[in-house]
């Protein structure tokens, strides 16, 4: 396993981050396709055996069950000081006022709830899951700074927002002398490259690492175009990401298949290798629900695409509508 520094920090993270949205309780939350605890634990254990030390979850995943499953597995299989646990705040955790968002009340309540579910007294990376247009960014950044100073988080990160919003947050923290974001968990893959326009140049300039979610486009880059899975058939959010660009996306998927065939490797390795070679990507967030998912992710670290292959993969791309959770409302 290869390791890199996260952003401009001294924190070492594996070049693959295990995304834990697929682990939890199928009966809790919005996704019936998630694995239960018994099914999830072998993937977390296998990731550790591969040298993966970076694990990403969120309070909203499986209504908190993901954090519970991840916390118990890591406690059983690893030493706390040897793993990097990342979680997120923003999503609705209870109905009514103050049940979601990035107010001081929500952040200070939810960090304690996440720590309790994870069974730890701190997280390594505490991320805001989305931008909150209903809370002043000064309130959010000060609350996050206080979380760090209280020892409940080592670093903070952000996810899925416009570049101008991220710059505003960075500027606010710098101007006030508060803790600064070190990572951006954004939506980036061969089927969606709009982040190359503003967010990636901003992160390069500011020394912020990318930890992209959905690097395999929810599996679309790994299988035949017409092939369906339980998740692809029931994942309503996923359908909204790709419904309008199907014909253009098909050409990219076919190009991935061609290069994978020429290299004699699975398509997932080609798609992940492309993300891994993007700067300033530290670690793509890879979900694993089958044993070969982790095998392919780790193998992708050794696959170096040529400039010609990268050009061939990128050539069919057409501009997409901005998506990936970027919206004006909670």
Task: For each feature predicted by the language model, list its residue ranges.
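Glycine-rich beta-alpha junction loops
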Residues: 89-91, 162, 188-192, 214-221, ...
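Terminal-tail/helix-coil boundary detector
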Residues: 1, 41, 205, 229-262, ...
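Generic structural signal for well-ordered alpha-helices
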Residues: 44, 67, 71, 111-115, ...
């Amino acid at each position: 396993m290869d390791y890199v520094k996260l952003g401009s920090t001294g924190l070492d993270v594996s070049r693959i981050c295990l995304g834990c949205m697929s682990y939890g309780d199928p009966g809790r939350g919005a996704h019936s396709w998630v694995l239960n605890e018994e099914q999830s634990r072998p993937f977390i254990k296998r990731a550790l055996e591969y040298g993966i030390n970076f694990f990403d979850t969120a309070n909203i995943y499986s209504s908190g069950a993901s954090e519970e499953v991840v916390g118990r597995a890591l406690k059983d299989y690893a030493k706390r000081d040897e793993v990097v646990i990342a979680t997120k705040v923003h999503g609705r955790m209870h109905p009514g006022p103050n049940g979601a968002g990035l107010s001081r009340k929500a952040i200070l309540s939810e960090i304690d709830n996440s720590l309790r579910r994870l069974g730890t007294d701190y997280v390594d990376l505490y991320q805001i899951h989305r931008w909150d247009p209903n809370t002043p960014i000064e309130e959010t950044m000060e609350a996050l700074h206080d979380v760090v100073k209280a020892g409940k988080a080592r670093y903070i990160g952000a996810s899925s927002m416009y570049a101008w919003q991220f710059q505003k947050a960075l500027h606010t923290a710098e101007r006030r002398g508060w803790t600064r974001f070190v990572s951006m968990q954004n939506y980036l893959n061969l089927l969606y490259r709009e982040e190359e326009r503003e967010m990636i140049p901003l992160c390069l300039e500011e020394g912020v690492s990318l930890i992209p979610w959905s690097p395999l486009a929810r599996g679309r880059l790994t299988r035949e175009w017409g092939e369906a899975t339980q998740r692809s058939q029931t994942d309503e959010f996923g359908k909204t990401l790709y419904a309008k660009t199907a014909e253009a996306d098909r050409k990219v998927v076919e190009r991935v298949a061609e290069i994978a065939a020429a290299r004699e490797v699975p398509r997932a390795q080609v798609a992940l290798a492309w993300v891994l070679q993007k700067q300033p990507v530290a670690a793509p967030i890879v979900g694993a629900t089958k044993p070969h998912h982790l095998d392919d992710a780790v193998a992708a670290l050794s696959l170096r695409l040529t400039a010609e292959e990268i050009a061939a993969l990128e050539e069919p791309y057409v501009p997409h509508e901005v998506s990936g959770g970027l919206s004006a409302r909670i």
